[in-house]
Amino acid sequence: LLHCDFVYVSDEARLAMPFVSLGLVPEFASSLLVPRLLGNVRAAEKLLLGDPFSPQDAVDAGIASAVLPAGEVVNHARRVAERFNTLPPGAVRETKKLMRRASADEVLKTIAVEGELFAQRLRSPEAMEAFQAFFQKRRPDFSKFS
């Protein structure tokens, strides 16, 4: 969601960033972009604890554009896409470049670092415990990992 131009969320959506609770690390520059959007304290709450948050919280944080009734999300997105397609493509392209210019290198570097760590964590005993617990429908026990 953090790399999308427009994000429309159903009022029935359940959102979370459960990386750590799964024994993983954030990916796709989430560790860079979430603190920029939310500030460090609120980002720590979302990224470290992974607690669910509401669609309206996502809008308030700048992660989503709007909350819509479940049956209207796709049609709304189509209307926005149709409107978007009427805009001058060169101006759109250059504006998007300008919007991302300052952070593009930093985002790419962060994605690379996160990708390496994510791959390592995916094979970690902690992640294995989290995945096994999920499939066994039990709470993971991380007490043996210090």
PLM regions and their residue ranges:
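CoA-thioester-processing core
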Residues: L2-L48, D60-A61, H76-V80
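C-terminal long alpha-helix characteristic of the crotonase
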Residues: Y8-A13, P55, V59, A64-Q120, ...
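K/E-rich alpha-helical interaction surfaces of small helical-bundle regulatory domains
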Residues: V9-S10, L48, M128-P140
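Hydrophobic alpha-helical segments typical of transmembrane helices
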Residues: A29-L33, R42, A91-E94, E114-L117, ...
